Amino acid sequence: MEIAVLDIKGKETGRKAKLSDSVFAIEPNDHAVYLDVKQYLANQRQGTHKAKERAEIKGSTRKIKKQKGTGTARAGSIKSPIFKGGGRVFGPRPRNYGFKLNKNLKRLARKSALSIKANDKAIMVIEDFSFDTPKTKNFTEVLKALGIESKKSLIVLGDSNKNVYLSSRNLKTSEVISSSELSTYKILNAKSIVFLEGSLEGIESKLS
């Protein structure tokens, strides 16, 4: 698969970037995509929730009233879950929601997501660029030239480019990442994906 390489003004450079069919044109595996996205979202959960059970509540353990003869239900400690301020029954405890997936499945999921976006014509390739100083205005002009300033976009860099990254941090609709940070969730969450020309080789070698 070949795609025209654009410059930062949105015009064709006359060059074509070759996208590997083994990465950008496979039959998507929906279940692999589902598992990888599920793992990504699970890993975002902090899992710090905690409720005190009756043994952890501060208070007296004396019996509230005598066992028999009151005509009402028997009752023990004030920390019982049936009373206001009592402990929680089977309350949430801190836990790690993350789970593991093997590398081959994660690789398949990423290739499936890229193939979906390629099939939807949602992928662009532009020549490598950088800024002398971080400036949001410069980055916004690039997005406007590409026609994606109002779309949720993902820009994938080949090498770490600090000024480009800093120029994008103030924008809600775009995210700049390095090729090593590319994930199935981020691919699917973006309406448009822009690859810098230098990022393709690293992505294809990692996923092939």
Swiss-Prot record:
Keyword RNA-binding: yes
GO biological process: translation
Entry-linked InterPro entries: Ribosomal_uL4, Ribosomal_uL4-like, Ribosomal_uL4_dom_sf
Stretches the record annotates as Disordered: 45-77
UniProt-recorded Gene Ontology molecular function terms: rRNA binding; structural constituent of ribosome
Domain of life of the source: Bacteria
Keywords: Ribonucleoprotein, Ribosomal protein, RNA-binding, rRNA-binding
One Pfam family it belongs to: Ribosomal_L4
A GO CC term assigned to this protein in UniProt: ribosome
Record-linked PANTHER family: 50S RIBOSOMAL PROTEIN L4, LARGE RIBOSOMAL SUBUNIT PROTEIN UL4M
Family label: Belongs to the universal ribosomal protein uL4 family.
Functional note: One of the primary rRNA binding proteins, this protein initially binds near the 5'-end of the 23S rRNA. It is important during the early stages of 50S assembly. It makes multiple contacts with different domains of the 23S rRNA in the assembled 50S subunit and ribosome. Forms part of the polypeptide exit tunnel.
Subunit structure of this chain's protein: Part of the 50S ribosomal subunit.
Name assigned to this protein: Large ribosomal subunit protein uL4
